[in-house]
C-alpha cells in the first residue's frame, strides 16, 4: 500500500556507503487522506516528524548494527482514557495534544566464520517507548537469536527464536458504574527452522505462543455491551510454510 499523505524527506550518507551509515529525516502531513489530493492540509500544523540513524559496527571483529530513531507528531488525537461526565459536559470525547515515540534496535553476530557471507549466529534486540497516551503501546521489548549455515553440510538452513513484551497503556472508561479497563500487557514467543530442501525449495516449521492484550470477549451487537468471555488464555499457533523460488 503506498503512502497517501504528502511528505518531505532527506537521506544522508555520512560515509558515502549506505551499508555503513544512514541518517534519515522525514516530515509528513498528518491530515493526509487517500481520497483527497492537493496541498490544502500541508501547512495546517498537524505534522509528523521522524528522524532515524543506522550504523554498522565491528565489535570484536564481528558485524553488527545499531539503529535509533524518534517520532513526534503535533496532531491532536483522541485520549485513551474517557470520562462520561466530560463527554456530556463538552459534547465531545477528551483529546490529547501531540504524541511522541522513541525506538532502538540492534543486531550483533556472535559467530561469523566469514565476513559478508550472511552465515553465522547472532542476537538482536529492540526497545521502544512512547507517551502512553494517545499511543496505546507505552513500552516494547524484544530479544532473540538467529543463525544461518551453522551446520557444515546445511549452508542454506536458517533458524531463529525470539520473545517480545508490550507494556500496554490500558484504556479506561469512567461512567456511572465506575472505571473499567479493557486491555492488559501482551507477550509472545516464536521459533522456526527454515530447511533448504533444495536451493529453490525451503520448508519452515514454526511455533508461536501469544498472550494477547485483549483480556475479555465483549459482544457489542446490542444496545449494552456484554462480556461473553471473562478471560482469554494464551494461544498456541503451529505453522508450516513451503517456499518455491523461481
What are the roles of these predicted feature ranges?
Residues 15-21, 56-65, 111-121, 149-158, ...:
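Short loop/turn motifs that connect adjacent beta-strands in outer-membrane beta-barrel proteins
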Residues 23-29, 66-72, 121-129, 143, ...:
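Transmembrane beta-barrel strands of outer-membrane/channel proteins
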Residues 1-53:
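Aromatic- and glycine-enriched pocket-lining scaffold segments that form the walls
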Residues 41-43, 96-97, 129-140:
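Solvent-exposed loop/turn segments connecting transmembrane beta-strands
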Residues 230-246:
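Outer-membrane beta-barrel "beta-signal"
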Residues 8-12, 51-57, 104-108, 143-147, ...:
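Residues on the lipid-exposed face of transmembrane beta-strands in outer-membrane beta-barrel proteins
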Residues 34-40, 77-85, 134-139, 171-177, ...:
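Outer-membrane beta-barrel translocator domains and adjoining extracellular loop/strand segments
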Residues 30-105:
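Surface-exposed beta-loop-beta
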Amino acid at each position: 500500500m503506498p503512502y497517501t499523505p504528502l511528505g518531505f524527506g532527506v537521506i544522508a550518507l555520512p560515509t558515502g556507503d549506505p551499508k555503513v551509515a544512514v541518517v534519515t529525516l522525514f516530515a509528513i502531513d498528518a491530515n493526509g487522506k487517500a481520497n483527497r489530493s492537493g496541498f490544502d492540509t500541508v501547512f495546517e500544523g498537524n505534522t509528523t516528524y521522524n528522524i532515524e540513524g543506522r550504523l554498522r559496527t565491528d565489535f570484536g571483529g564481528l558485524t553488527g548494527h545499531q539503529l535509533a530513531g524518534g517520532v513526534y507528531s503535533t496532531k491532536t488525537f483522541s485520549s485513551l482514557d474517557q470520562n462520561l461526565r466530560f463527554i456530556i459536559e463538552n459534547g465531545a470525547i477528551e483529546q490529547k495534544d501531540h504524541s511522541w515515540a522513541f525506538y532502538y534496535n540492534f543486531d550483533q553476530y556472535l559467530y561469523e566464520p566469514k565476513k559478508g557471507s550472511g552465515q553465522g549466529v547472532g542476537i538482536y534486540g529492540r526497545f521502544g517507548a512512547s507517551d502512553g497516551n494517545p499511543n496505546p503501546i507505552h513500552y516494547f521489548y524484544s530479544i532473540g537469536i538467529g543463525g544461518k549455515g551453522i551446520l557444515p553440510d546445511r549452508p542454506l538452513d536458517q533458524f531463529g527464536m525470539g520473545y517480545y513484551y508490550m507494556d500496554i497503556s490500558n484504556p479506561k472508561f469512567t461512567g456511572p458504574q465506575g472505571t473499567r479497563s479493557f486491555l492488559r500487557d501482551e507477550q509472545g514467543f516464536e521459533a522456526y527452522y527454515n530447511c533448504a530442501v533444495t536451493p529453490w525449495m525451503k520448508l519452515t516449521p514454526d511455533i508461536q505462543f501469544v498472550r494477547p492484550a485483549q483480556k475479555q470477549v465483549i459482544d457489542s451487537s446490542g444496545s449494552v455491551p456484554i462480556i461473553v468471555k471473562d478471560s482469554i488464555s494464551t494461544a498456541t499457533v503451529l505453522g508450516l510454510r513451503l517456499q518455491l523460488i523461481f
